[in-house]
């Protein structure tokens, strides 16, 4: 019988893959972003509105020396996770992540989904030649070769059946589309009423999304064991 022996959680922010000298670029991206969503209300604010509400002390933290130290700290923390994982030597990794508009679209958007095919493909991220240095650095933070990752189908099926028995409305999948694409609508409250935007993704070759492939690269260090991916 399977036992839960180790739990690990990690961010997979692009900043974790990028050198500290590129971190300031995210402020420029935020100025262009029309979907700056703030907790706990989920309200959408413009960059200027967010700046007015922000703690003024944050400005003192926005410099290269502090970013460099923060990058060193996050690298050390992820290395610690990788060492903990390696030393524990798990037989199976149940991996829970958010799709973030990569594989699931509004033609079928499950609340949560358990994958129980025999394996799941990963395809390397390939930025355009004219992509920004930040985008290239992010892509390099994921596995650089195509992978066929084994799935522990018996455990995955057990999770599906257990959840059904306990009245959870769980979705399941034994395979993923080779060239997924579609639309996802985002709806947020704002001072002027609800804002709705639609993100369109053209069909393209895609496999295991980045929330999981980041862990494969940085925590598992591409030493593959059977996994159970849960969306």
Indicate residue ranges for each PLM-predicted region:
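Active-site histidine-anchored catalytic micro-motif
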Residues: 2-231
């Amino acid at each position: 019988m399977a036992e839960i022996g180790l739990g690990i959680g990690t961010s997979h922010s692009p900043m974790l893959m990028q050198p500290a000298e590129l971190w300031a670029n995210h402020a420029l991206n935020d100025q262009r972003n029309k979907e700056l969503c703030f907790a706990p209300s989920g309200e959408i604010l413009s960059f200027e509105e967010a700046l007015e509400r922000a703690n003024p002390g944050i400005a003192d933290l926005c410099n290269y020396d502090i970013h460099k130290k923060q990058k060193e700290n996050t690298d050390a923390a992820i290395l610690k996770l990788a060492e903990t994982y390696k030393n524990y030597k798990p037989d199976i990794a149940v991996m829970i992540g958010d799709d973030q508009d990569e594989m699931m679209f509004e033609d079928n958007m499950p609340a949560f989904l358990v994958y129980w095919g025999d394996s799941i493909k990963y395809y390397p991220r390939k930025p355009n030649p004219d992509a920004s240095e930040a985008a290239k650095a992010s892509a390099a933070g994921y596995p650089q070769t195509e992978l066929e990752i084994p799935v522990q189908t018996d455990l995955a099926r057990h999770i599906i059946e257990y959840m059904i028995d306990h009245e959870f409305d769980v979705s399941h999948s034994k395979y993923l589309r080779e060239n997924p694409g579609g639309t996802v609508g985002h709806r947020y409250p704002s001072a002027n009423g609800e804002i709705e935007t639609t993100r369109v993704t053209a069909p393209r070759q895609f496999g295991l999304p980045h929330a999981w492939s980041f862990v494969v690269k940085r925590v598992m260090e591409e030493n593959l064991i059977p996994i159970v991916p849960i969306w």
